[in-house]
């Protein structure tokens, strides 16, 4: 979580995304949304990990800061979710990389959070296999983000129980980590910006 503060202090030195390519590939995708080549180009241009994602789509109150990417976050993330031609394993790995190290926050991180949940419901077997291949600490980081809720409800609880019941035999250790994350982060966090303000 401390990384978020560091990035907020000076994102330029960390930004590795070609935003011109990202924006141009998004515009091309809008013209041909079913094109597998346009989908792949946009997918490849999209941030590959949480650090780059945060630096690309973050909000900054500093005078003169260009908020065009912040404003484009929702449309870009929805477009990413619509890239159905991308190999499922590749797509799930990308969502895992975007989630590991992430903190719940308004706008872009919240949109990402929703996309990861939607894809988990559609491709849980692939998600779980990909997660089982990464280090246990990074598994915990994924579940931390995935299960973070400021105020959770019955739907979240039923989703957790369903996933846990479905995979506890195949991935017992990972389901233990998932349960720990649920206990601590579901109804147990604030948006990270609110947390910093409350210190």
Write out the residue ranges for each language-model feature:
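Bacterial Sec-dependent N-terminal signal peptides
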Residues: 1-21
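Compositionally biased, intrinsically disordered low-complexity segments
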Residues: 4-10, 80, 148, 153
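Preference for long, solvent-exposed alpha-helical segments and helix-linker "stalks"
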Residues: 14-70, 133-137, 163-168, 172-175, ...
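Surface-exposed acidic loop/strand-edge motifs in secreted or periplasmic proteins
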Residues: 42-122
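Extended alpha-helical scaffolding segments
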Residues: 89-199
């Amino acid at each position: 979580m401390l990384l978020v503060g560091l990035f907020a202090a000076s994102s330029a030195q960390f930004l590795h995304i070609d935003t011109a390519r990202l924006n141009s590939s998004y515009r091309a995708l809008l013209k041909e949304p079913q094109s597998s080549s346009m989908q792949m180009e946009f997918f490849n241009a999209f941030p590959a990990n949480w650090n780059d994602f945060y630096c690309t789509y973050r909000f900054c109150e500093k005078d003169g800061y260009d908020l065009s990417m912040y404003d484009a976050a929702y449309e870009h993330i929805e477009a990413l979710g619509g890239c159905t031609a991308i190999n499922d394993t590749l797509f799930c790995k990308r969502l895992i990389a975007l989630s590991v190290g992430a903190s719940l926050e308004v706008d872009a991180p919240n949109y990402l959070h929703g996309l990861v949940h939607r894809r988990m419901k559609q491709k849980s077997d692939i998600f779980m296999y990909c997660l089982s291949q990464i280090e246990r600490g990074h598994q915990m980081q994924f579940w931390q983000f995935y299960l973070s809720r400021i105020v959770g409800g019955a739907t979240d609880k039923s989703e957790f129980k369903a996933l846990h019941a479905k995979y506890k035999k195949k991935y017992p250790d990972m389901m233990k980590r998932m349960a720990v994350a649920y206990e601590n982060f579901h109804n147990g966090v604030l948006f990270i910006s609110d947390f910093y303000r409350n210190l």
